[in-house]
Amino acid sequence: MTVAITQTGPALQEFVERHQRLFVLSGAGCSTDSGIPDYRDLQGGWKRPQPVTFQAFMGELSTRQRYWARSLVGWPRFGLARPNATHHALAALEARGQLELLLTQNVDRLHQAAGSQAVIDLHGRLDVVRCMGCEQRMPRTEFQLLLERDNPGWADLEAAQAPDGDADLDNVAFDNFVVPACPACGGVLKPDVVFFGENVPRERVERAFAHLQAADAVLVVGSSLMVYSGFRFVQAAARAGLPIAALNFGRTRADDLLSLKVEQSCAQALAFLQQPPDPLHTATARYHSARSA
């Protein structure tokens, strides 16, 4: 397939206007304007060491000590993040009645904070902590109090923000860091997110695929799609013959599957969604779409 690449928004606006049941797949690029760093460079490679795996977190106390120490320092800023123009634009798309589903790979809940309701958090949510033993859950804000209680002085450390709500703590020893256990059963507590090496819950995947089957097009926003758990939805859309557009700087894993690729700021490219739709423009776009179908 020959991909249409543009540096401007009109082609994307036309793509959106001619579809009524968009399946939107969002990634870390949506939240960078909210102060949350992304993971990948323009070639799709890691900007920093790969995140902790599920197996290491569950199997090694030292990994949990390092993870929760970094999280203790990084959480306050992450928890204060607020939706940006991209989140509000996608909420406006839903308000227009053109959204089938917003499937987000992000764990920050900023889409919901912006007003989006038809959202599935593919990789879970960082504002909840889950016991891997008894399945009890608690708010991350409540767990922060336990972390600070058991580790006085750590909250005062300064460090650069990292993508997973943690912080880049360098030259710090974690051996004496105390990781609180589940208050109910003494089990291992883990953020309620899907780690690398961990499976996305089947029910969540099946719900997302059901919405994909009802969609008439796919729009990828702020994702390189390098993680298979998100990429597989674009693969399925391509097999079904759905038009696919991507709004993302740099290479994506799906470049050869795209109908349209826009390399522009997400907020700038989607700004038209926060303006009243132009009936003539919309009608023209849908007319041309019907003729080409």
UniProtKB/Swiss-Prot annotation:
Broad enzyme group: transferase
- Asked whether the keyword Cytoplasm is assigned, the reply is yes
Cofactor binding note from Swiss-Prot or TrEMBL: Binds 1 zinc ion per subunit.
Swiss-Prot/TrEMBL catalytic activity: N(6)-acetyl-L-lysyl-[protein] + NAD(+) + H2O = 2''-O-acetyl-ADP-D-ribose + nicotinamide + L-lysyl-[protein]
Q: Which residues bind NAD(+)?
A: 27-47, 105-108, 222-224, 248-250, 266
Choose one Gene Ontology CC annotation of this protein and give it.
cytoplasm
Tell me yes or no: is Transferase among this UniProt entry's keywords: yes
Q: List the keywords (alphabetical).
A: Cytoplasm, Metal-binding, NAD, Transferase, Zinc
Q: Residues that bind Zn(2+), according to the entry? A: 131, 134, 182, 185
Physiological role: NAD-dependent protein deacetylase which modulates the activities of several enzymes which are inactive in their acetylated form.
List the HAMAP family hit by this protein, alphabetically: Sirtuin_ClassII
Query: Belongs to which family?
Result: Belongs to the sirtuin family. Class II subfamily.
- Name of the protein this chain belongs to: NAD-dependent protein deacetylase
Whichever gene encodes this chain, its name is cobB
